[in-house]
């Protein structure tokens, strides 16, 4: 699994001491390296410049994932990142006393108790903690549920102004949407989180 690079200036994550993002800034100059030219599919068939998708960072620790989100905000890349997290939720680790061998075989998407606890964890902890790490407002109250026999996925989307004025977003051309996908399967309590910020 690819790890996030550690910088010398990296600070431990303190959710109670994350600085909010008060004002937007211009797009970082390094972003121009991510612009690629592709052939347009419209009738003219010209060449159009588009922004390549951000590099996906993989994590297996919730704290490291939250620190990554915080660092992207500090680096002024809050509107252009993609992170994936695979982890056992804290309520499972508490239940098995941090011993993975003691995880109940029924702790999966087929258990109503597990789904209820996971929904509570996502709504009351994960999204709230991500909001602190981002430093701006998240509006992820509504979600779509996709359930198959093997997997359940909750998809959240935030296309709001994130607490900034329209004038400020227009001034720096910083319009972005956030997509959060949380899923689990019918075999184990491992939770998969996919979180991305996409400029629009």
Curated annotation (Swiss-Prot):
Q: How does it sit in the membrane?
A: Peripheral membrane protein
Sorted alphabetically, which keywords does the UniProt record give? Answer: Cell membrane, Membrane
Q: Which GO terms describe its biological process?
A: energy reserve metabolic process
Q: InterPro entries, from UniProt? A: RGI1, RGI1_sf
**CC per GO annotation:** plasma membrane
User: What compartments host this protein?
Assistant: Cell membrane
Q: What is its main location?
A: membrane
Q: Which Pfam families match?
A: RGI1
- The segments labelled Disordered in the record are 1-26
* Bilayer-crossing regions: none
What this chain does, per the entry, is described as:
Involved in the control of energetic metabolism and significantly contribute to cell fitness, especially under respiratory growth conditions.
| Family per similarity comment | Belongs to the RGI1 family.
Please give the name of this protein.
Respiratory growth induced protein 1
Q: Which organism is it from?
A: Scheffersomyces stipitis (strain ATCC 58785 / CBS 6054 / NBRC 10063 / NRRL Y-11545)
The top of its lineage is: Eukaryota, Fungi, Dikarya, Ascomycota, Saccharomycotina
């Amino acid at each position: 699994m690819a790890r996030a690079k550690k910088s010398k200036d990296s600070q431990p994550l303190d959710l109670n001491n994350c600085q909010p993002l008060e004002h937007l800034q211009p797009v970082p100059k390094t972003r121009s390296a991510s612009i690629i030219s592709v052939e347009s599919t419209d009738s003219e068939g010209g060449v159009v410049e588009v922004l390549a998708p951000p590099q996906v960072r993989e994590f297996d620790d919730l704290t490291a994932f939250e620190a990554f989100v915080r660092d992207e905000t500090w680096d002024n890349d809050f509107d252009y990142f993609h992170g994936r997290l695979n982890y056992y939720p804290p309520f499972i680790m508490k239940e098995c006393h941090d011993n993975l061998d003691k995880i109940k075989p029924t702790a999966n998407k087929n258990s109503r108790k597990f789904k209820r606890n996971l929904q509570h964890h996502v709504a009351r902890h994960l999204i709230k903690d991500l909001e602190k790490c981002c430093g701006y407002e998240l509006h992820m109250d509504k979600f779509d549920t996709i359930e198959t026999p093997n997997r359940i996925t909750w998809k959240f989307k935030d296309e709001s102004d994130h607490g900034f004025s329209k004038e400020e977003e227009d001034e720096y051309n910083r319009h972005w949407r956030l997509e959060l996908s949380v899923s689990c399967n019918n075999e184990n309590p491992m939770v998969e989180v996919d979180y991305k910020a996409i400029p629009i």
